[in-house]
Amino acid sequence: MAPVNNAHPSTQALHADDYLNLVTDVAPPIHLSTIFRYPNDPNQLVIPEDPIAEFDGKNYVYSREFAPNATRFEAVLSSLLKGHAVSYGSGLAALYAALTLLNPRRISVGDGYHGSHEVISVISRLSGLQKFDLDCPAEILGEGDVILLETPVNPLGTAFNIEEYAKKAHSRGAYLIVDSTFGPPGLQDPFLWGADIVFHSGSKYFGGHSDMLCGVLAVKREDWLKRLYEDRVALGSNIGNLEGWMGLRSLRTLEVRVQRASENCAKLISWLDAAMKTPDPVQGSEEFVVQAVLQKMYHASLQNEPWLAKQMPCGFGPVFSIILRDETFAKTLPSKLNFFQHATSLGGVESLIEWRALSDSKVDRKLLRVSIGLENWEDLKADLLQAFTSLTRES
């Protein structure tokens, strides 16, 4: 495993699971079975003392414990995330698992993804977990408590300083969970900046094709890994067999997908930002049309923060948000676009746009979240421009 662990991430994505291959197939086969035969030799029938600890990547028994597709998926993720990866049936199932593991009395969390707050509400109902703002005084937190930091944050796409929040948490004996969904491997390594647990909604960039649900936790501590496995067996929150295979297939192209989408996004942000900053644009020009429709734009690349280039040295993510001049513009723009699907979620190969209020009623009703895909960026630019122009003509 050492040569693979020392390899480039693109190589790891293709070979980190080679040692788990049980067949001669080059492409990993789809294992759908939920049960596996015991040995025929009675002498090999040994009652396990600890099925989790004794799993060797081959002695499968029941898929709620371990399954071939998910095990290979987790092997690649462990290499890419630089920690022990555990997969779940959804991102929120993964977050629930993290909070079950740590069992904090208090949690400090920002606005971010509304689903995370729903999980916190369930935990609070069961355990009395208290929720505080992300920037609450450090003195509120105690030993074993949690800061849940989403960066870049949903839906804006802006970033927070992971190291700053790690120091805050650790100064109080608390833990830092980083939701790095918007900053997949290749863009951001939260462990490098002090994260204790890294969390991803794998439905996004790990799946990458808008066709699977998945959640992932990565940890450094062996005792946490074992407890996560044990809890997953007890709660039955495993990723499905087919989803495990789909996730493995998709990880093979993770780096090239994320790079292309991030480059596309950077070019579009640069164009829109320049247009919005042009003084006294000529009526009818691109700059005039953009300014007539857009009021504000959010993306990590627009932040002038000295720490950000270190935290995200290879790009700032393919998701950004725009605030339009009025709510009617925001509701109408998606219907004017040809190459952007009006749908929720993000991280797929196709570009998406969402009037975000449909998913999260608490956000600004003039806000649209944009997830950039793998199309040619100039086609996306032309599509946005024609849609903006159409809105100005109808207003």
PLM features: residue spans?
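Conserved PLP-enzyme active-site core in the AAT-like
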Residues: 2-6, 10-19, 81-292, 298, ...
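N-terminal amphipathic/basic leader segments beginning at the initiator methionine
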Residues: 2-48
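Conserved C-terminal alpha-helix-loop-beta "cap" of PLP-dependent enzymes
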Residues: 15, 19-20, 281-368, 372
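Conserved N-terminal alpha-helix of the aminotransferase class I/II PLP-enzyme fold
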Residues: 28-30, 35-101, 112-124
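Short loop segments at secondary-structure junctions
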Residues: 35, 41, 219-224, 251, ...
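Hydrophobic side chains in well-ordered alpha-helices
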Residues: 73, 228, 329-333, 380-384
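PLP-dependent enzyme catalytic core of the Aspartate aminotransferase-like
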Residues: 83, 105-108, 114, 122, ...
